[in-house]
């Protein structure tokens, strides 16, 4: 056989092997944990017992209730303690490790309760406080209908110092002040809007202490766009007492509106992005998951962490559709985005109703 013929045969065999490799999909290897569950990385197996424990004993049997709301709040209050100029370790668990310092910051009012609830789980399991806070937040959101699987990375080292004070935005701060603080931490104005999808499953205890557990929208147990709709409605009342710092009038009895949410929904820097979230569940889910993942990595070296995102449960499907509350019409919308029309929504039938407090608050 001539060298020319041999070369041609080798090329043909190489092409055939290459074609076969392309045609046969690679089989992704998965680790089987002691309890039979599988994950992409064996190091993630330690999370399954923690998952079972918090679903049963922190989240009351995998509910989307008060402890989920507070755990999600804690992810932000821990992570946003980060500034390239002012210091802070970001998502490092310092709010638990140095709780006697950080829970006394004015912006962290009331957060001592969820810190106290989570500390025994951190002590019980082989996990750092920084990892536990972000893991619990991601698991909690997955309990909510319409929720998302927030990516989770394992391996944050223990915090070495408390966060500086004054890094958590307050509800009475101006839009410019909030965007400046968030910009310092690496977030654009639109990412601030995306993060605020968290208020779809949130409530306030301390803005008006007379009405603890008052939600920010009418569906606090569902991760949906009602928060973005209802913050654009004309305010009619204060659900409790008036003249509370950081509170604006709400459209519904039993629903509280933060002054910061009211202003961000109407500010030229954020209004159109805010409106774009209305009745756009895929966008809310995708943007929130991506931005929460970014926040959860503040102050961390991602290359040193392990991707354990597949441990996070799949959330229940969204129930219900975007709507105006009963008794409201599109004329009640204070539209601040001139670039696009406000989405066409219908109102629930019946008279105006009130929103009950979040159970367990």
Curated annotation (Swiss-Prot):
GO terms for cellular component: extracellular region. Binds 1 heme b (iron(II)-protoporphyrin IX) group per subunit. Binds 2 calcium ions per subunit. Its EC number is 1.11.1.16. PROSITE patterns: PEROXIDASE_1 (PS00435), PEROXIDASE_2 (PS00436), PEROXIDASE_4 (PS50873). Heme b binds at residues 199, 203-207. It is found in: Secreted. Mn(2+) binds at residues 66, 70, 205. Keywords: Calcium, Disulfide bond, Glycoprotein, Heme, Hydrogen peroxide, Iron, Lignin degradation, Manganese, Metal-binding, Organic radical, Oxidoreductase, Peroxidase, Secreted, Signal, Zymogen. Its cofactor is heme b; Ca(2+). It comes from the Eukaryota. GO terms for molecular function: heme binding; manganese peroxidase activity; metal ion binding; reactive-black-5:hydrogen-peroxide oxidoreductase activity. Ca(2+) 2 binds at residues 200, 217, 219, 222, 224. Ca(2+) 1 binds at residues 78, 90, 92, 94. It catalyses: 1-(4-hydroxy-3-methoxyphenyl)-2-(2-methoxyphenoxy)propane-1,3-diol + H2O2 = guaiacol + vanillin + glycolaldehyde + H2O; 2 Mn(2+) + H2O2 + 2 H(+) = 2 Mn(3+) + 2 H2O. Belongs to the peroxidase family. Ligninase subfamily. A versatile ligninolytic peroxidase that combines the substrate specificity characteristics of the two other ligninolytic peroxidases, manganese peroxidase and lignin peroxidase. This is Versatile peroxidase VPL2. The lineage of its organism: Eukaryota, Fungi, Dikarya, Basidiomycota, Agaricomycotina. The gene is vpl2.
């Amino acid at each position: 056989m001539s060298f020319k013929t041999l070369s041609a045969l080798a090329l043909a065999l190489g092409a055939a092997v290459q074609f076969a490799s392309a045609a046969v999909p690679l089989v992704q290897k998965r680790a089987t944990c002691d309890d039979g569950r599988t994950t992409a990385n064996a190091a993630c197996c330690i999370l399954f017992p923690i998952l079972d424990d918090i679903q049963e004993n922190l989240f009351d049997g995998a509910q989307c209730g008060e402890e989920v709301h507070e755990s999600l709040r804690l992810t932000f209050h821990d992570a946003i303690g980060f500034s390239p100029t002012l210091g802070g370790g970001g998502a490092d668990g310092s709010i638990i490790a140095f709780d006697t310092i950080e829970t006394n910051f004015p912006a962290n009012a009331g957060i001592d309760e969820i810190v106290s609830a989570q500390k025994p789980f951190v002590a019980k399991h082989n996990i750092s406080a920084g990892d536990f806070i972000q893991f619990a937040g991601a698991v909690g959101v997955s309990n909510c209908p319409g929720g998302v699987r927030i990516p989770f990375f394992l391996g944050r080292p223990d915090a070495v110092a408390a966060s500086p004070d004054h890094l958590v935005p307050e509800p009475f701060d101006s839009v410019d002040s909030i965007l400046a603080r968030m910009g310092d931490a690496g977030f654009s104005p639109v990412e601030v809007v995306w993060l605020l999808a968290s208020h779809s499953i949130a409530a306030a205890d301390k803005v008006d202490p007379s009405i603890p557990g008052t939600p920010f929208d009418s569906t606090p147990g569902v991760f949906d766009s009602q928060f973005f709709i209802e913050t654009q409605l004309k305010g009619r009342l204060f659900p409790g007492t008036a003249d509370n710092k950081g509170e604006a009038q709400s459209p519904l009895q039993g629903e509280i509106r933060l002054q910061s949410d009211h202003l961000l929904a109407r500010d030229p820097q954020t209004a159109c992005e805010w409106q774009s979230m209305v009745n756009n569940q895929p966008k809310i889910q995708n943007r929130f998951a991506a931005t929460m993942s970014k926040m959860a990595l503040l102050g961390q070296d991602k290359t040193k962490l392990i991707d354990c995102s597949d441990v996070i449960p799949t959330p229940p499907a969204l129930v219900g559709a975007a709507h105006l509350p009963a008794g409201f019409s599109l004329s009640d919308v204070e539209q601040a985005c001139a670039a696009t029309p406000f989405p066409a929504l219908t109102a629930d039938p019946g008279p105006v109703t009130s929103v009950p407090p979040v159970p367990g608050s």
